[in-house]
Regions:
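A glycine-rich helix->loop->beta "capping" turn
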Residues: 50-54, 74-87, 93-98
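Conserved hydrophobic beta-strands of the Rossmann-like cofactor-binding core
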Residues: 4-7, 85-86, 138
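A short, exposed helix-loop element centered on a Lys and neighboring polar residues
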Residues: 118-119, 180
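The beta1-alpha1 cofactor-binding region of Rossmann-like NAD(H)/NADP(H)-dependent oxidoreductases
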Residues: 36, 58-73
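Catalytic loop of short-chain dehydrogenase/reductase
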Residues: 90-107, 126-190, 197-212
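Canonical Rossmann dinucleotide-binding motif of NAD(H)/NADP(H)-dependent dehydrogenases/reductases
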Residues: 1-36
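C-terminal helical subdomain
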Residues: 195, 212-261, 265, 269
Length: 273
């Protein structure tokens, strides 16, 4: 049976390049996006490029906890096994917006939604690891911007200190801390968790957040996710952070065990777990 991977935000950009490469390599890929129209179009295009590829799709908004719960339920109903979760989707907001759950949009989409999704899918990931006798993977796509981030535990929605970059950097630091916390919570025989900076890549997010900046190709940005998702034997310990494919020490804030525990507790409370 093919190994199964869910790649969030895989209708375009790095996520699509990741999904394409993993499908080409023989994995069953679940394409995810907020729009069903875009998910269906991506699957149709990938099917044309990769005859015989095993593809499925799911659409839900990571910024809505209700939508995340419904999306996770769809996945669990339709997919009996799940071996890899690539938390790739992300945004850079141009203005401060609060979701229906009362959470600042960047934090909701980039961290809290993936946090909730990961926990809802975790039992299936662990079951699949036991059956396959290969550790399942959670891969969080973050950014070098995490080094400029600060976790505002008393104001995670940044009501008093919002800028687009501050919100983005906080969410990317949370991604690194999330992967490290997963590595602490699950034995490596069952789960391997990683975070990675893909490089400065020509994506919609780069243009929205940083203007007309020249970046590398999406295929280049997908390389680390593809390697970590596809390898049967782990090349690096669980919890490792990669920068452009190289295992690297993350920011000091991400290495603070007490801060990671506090973020986990706050995230679980906000997500209703």
């Amino acid at each position: 049976m093919s190994r199964v991977v869910l790649v969030t935000g895989s209708t375009d950009g790095i996520g699509r390049a990741t999904a394409r490469a993993l499908a080409a390599g023989g994995m069953k890929v679940i394409v995810h996006g907020r729009s069903k129209v875009k998910v269906d179009a991506a699957i149709e295009q990938l099917s044309g490029e990769l005859p015989g590829a095993e593809l499925d799709g799911v659409s839900f908004d990571l910024g809505s906890q209700k939508a995340v719960r419904n999306g996770a339920a769809q996945i669990l109903e339709r997919v009996p096994a799940l071996h890899v979760l690539v938390n790739n989707a992300g945004i850079f907001a141009g203005e401060r917006t609060v979701t229906d759950d009362g959470i600042e949009l960047t934090f909701a989409v980039n961290h809290l939604g993936p946090f909730l999704l990961t926990e809802l899918l975790m039992p299936r990931l662990l079951e699949s690891a036991a059956t396959a006798k290969i550790p399942s993977r959670v891969i969080d796509v973050t950014s070098i911007a995490h080094t400029r981030g600060r976790i505002h535990l008393d104001d995670l929605s940044l009501a008093n200190a919002w800028t687009g970059y501050a919100a983005y950097a906080q969410s990317k630091l949370a991604n690194v801390m999330h992967a490290h916390s997963l590595a602490e919570r699950h034995p490596p025989a069952s789960l391997l968790a990683y975070s990675l900076h893909p490089g400065v890549i020509s994506t919609k997010l780069l243009r929205q957040g940083f203007g007309p900046v020249t970046g590398a190709t999406t295929e280049s940005g997908a390389k680390t996710s593809i390697r970590l998702a596809g390898e049967e034997v782990a090349s690096e310990p669980s919890g490792t952070y990669f920068s452009e494919g190289v295992a690297t020490q993350p920011a000091a804030a991400a290495r603070d065990a007490a801060a990671r525990a506090a973020l986990w507790e706050a995230s679980a409370k906000l997500a209703g777990l």
